[in-house]
């Protein structure tokens, strides 16, 4: 039962509020809404010269006037629709080649004013959060609303046990790696050296399951050659790691107990530097992507371009590429004369074996890449971006790791991602560019860099 006070029993402030709600209708700020979806911006994406209809929702009979405010002026909006709770106002604009910034302003009959942009409804306008129309900026339609399934390959399914990382195969961060025999064993706290044996054949074997689950896109954590199970310390951007793909040459020995010298890890050296293994792994990956596409699913791979790994062939801190039966250039750790010297920032000139390179967040296993100091490095990574979205691999997009950290300045970071976008989109216009970023991604989403970001903020700190 609802109890209602009589006006005689109301306190003074309650009487005042009752009067205001009846004589001076309160502006219902929470009823205001607009966004960049088709319901409120039609079309959501446009080209120069297109007419775009912009819509604002308000409380029913709550607003006297509504305005669309753009860089070019203020336009009175027309009420075009209503339902039981809301009114809908609309205005149209014709876009040019320039980005169009806009927000909404509403007024009540009694002069109350409120603004609405991406931050929501407010009494004071902060134009930093205005909506933007970016002519020509289009995200691939297949990515919108797609169900994406992330696969950390080592922990998904083991389809080719003969490729498993072996006990003592090599040394990583001070200890030997090991093969986990019990798939259900809980990982150790420092479990980067533990390999459960998941591989791409395991993914292939489960494609029926993924398809029946309703997956639209498979997003793979890094797949390139790497000594860790997470593979965010890439050793070779040109090849899929044979441990998760195809090993056709498998010669050499594992490390003896107590031996931490990876030049003696000849089994590992053969597995990851022998071009027969590397080329077979790339061919296998191309076949897997083709099979995934046949089932109507897409593939996104992880691009770790801010830093590489200390095992990387450009640095070769472990001296494994200099021990390979195939010919590789000397690494920048080994020799000052290395063709990759400029790929890294060194703080001393003490060669050979110069360990003074800059590591991302101080981690010597994650050498930061020195783009500003090396045009050759920049061109190499731009070619990598193009390579994997092109024939024969035909990957459908990149997920960019710590994308805002790349480079040593914000100015260069934006410059690089503009070049990366052009390189990728020229090769495959339907490839998506999805960045990892915490915080406000506004500056990267102006149509010339990333397509979108992973929504870490909302999930981790809602």
Predicted regions and their residues:
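Structured loops at beta-to-helix junctions and adjacent beta-edge loops in soluble globular domains
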Residues: 59, 105-107, 134, 152-154, ...
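Short, flexible loop/turn elements at secondary-structure junctions
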Residues: 58-60, 81, 93-95, 152-157, ...
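Active-site cleft segment of glycoside hydrolase catalytic domains centered on the general acid/base Glu
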Residues: 367-375, 402-421
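Glycan-association/targeting regions that enable binding to alpha-glucans and other polysaccharides
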Residues: 1-145, 149-150
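Conserved alpha/beta catalytic core and glycan-binding cleft of carbohydrate-active enzymes
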Residues: 141, 311-315, 385-386, 392-394, ...
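Hydrophobic faces of well-ordered beta-strands that scaffold small-molecule active sites
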Residues: 147-149, 218-220, 299-301, 398, ...
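Substrate-binding/active-site clefts of carbohydrate-active enzymes
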Residues: 153-216, 222-392, 420, 426, ...
């Amino acid at each position: 039962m609802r109890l209602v006070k009589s006006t005689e029993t109301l306190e003074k402030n309650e009487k005042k509020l009752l009067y205001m709600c009846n004589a001076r209708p309160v502006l219902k700020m929470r009823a205001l809404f607009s966004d960049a979806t088709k319901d409120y911006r039609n079309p959501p994406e446009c080209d120069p010269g297109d007419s775009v209809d912009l819509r604002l929702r308000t409380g029913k009979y709550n607003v006297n006037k509504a305005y669309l405010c753009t860089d070019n002026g203020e336009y009175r909006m027309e009420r075009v629709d209503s339902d039981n709770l809301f009114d809908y106002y609309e205005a149209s604009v014709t876009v040019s080649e320039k980005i169009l910034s806009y927000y909404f302003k509403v007024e009540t009959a009694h002069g109350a004013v409120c603004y609405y942009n991406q931050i929501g409804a407010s009494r004071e306008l902060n134009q930093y959060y205005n909506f933007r129309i970016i002519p020509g900026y289009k995200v691939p339609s297949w990515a919108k609303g797609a169900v994406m399934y992330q696969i950390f390959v080592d922990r998904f399914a083991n389809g080719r046990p003969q490729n498993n990382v072996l006990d003592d195969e090599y040394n990583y961060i001070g200890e030997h790696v090991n093969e986990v025999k019990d798939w259900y064993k809980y990982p150790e706290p420092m479990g980067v050296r533990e390999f459960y044996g998941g591989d791409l054949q395991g993914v292939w074997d489960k494609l029926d399951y993924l398809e029946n689950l309703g997956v639209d896109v498979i997003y793979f954590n890094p797949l390139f050659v790497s000594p860790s199970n997470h593979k965010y310390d890439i050793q070779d951007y040109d090849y899929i790691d044979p441990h998760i793909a195809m090993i056709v040459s498998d010669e050499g020995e594992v490390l003896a107990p107590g031996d931490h010298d990876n030049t003696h890890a000849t089994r590992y050296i053969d597995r990851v530097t022998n071009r027969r293994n590397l080329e077979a792994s790339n061919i296998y990956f191309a076949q897997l992507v083709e099979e995934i596409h046949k089932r109507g699913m897409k593939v996104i791979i992880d691009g770790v371009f801010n830093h590489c790994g200390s095992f990387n062939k450009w640095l070769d801190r472990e001296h494994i590429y200099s021990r390979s039966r195939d010919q590789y250039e000397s690494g920048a750790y080994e020799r000052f004369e290395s063709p990759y010297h400029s790929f890294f920032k060194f703080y001393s000139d003490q060669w050979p074996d110069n360990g003074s390179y800059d590591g991302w967040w101080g981690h010597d296993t994650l050498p930061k890449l020195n783009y500003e100091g090396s045009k050759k490095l920049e061109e190499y990574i731009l070619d990598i971006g193009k390579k994997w979205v092109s024939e024969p691999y035909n990957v459908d997009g990149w997920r960019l790791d710590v994308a805002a950290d790349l480079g040593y300045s914000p100015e260069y970071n934006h410059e690089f991602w503009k070049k990366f976008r052009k390189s990728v989109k020229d090769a495959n216009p339907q490839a998506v560019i999805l960045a990892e970023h915490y915080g406000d991604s506004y500056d990267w989403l102006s149509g010339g860099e990333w397509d979108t970001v992973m929504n870490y903020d909302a999930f981790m700190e809602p």
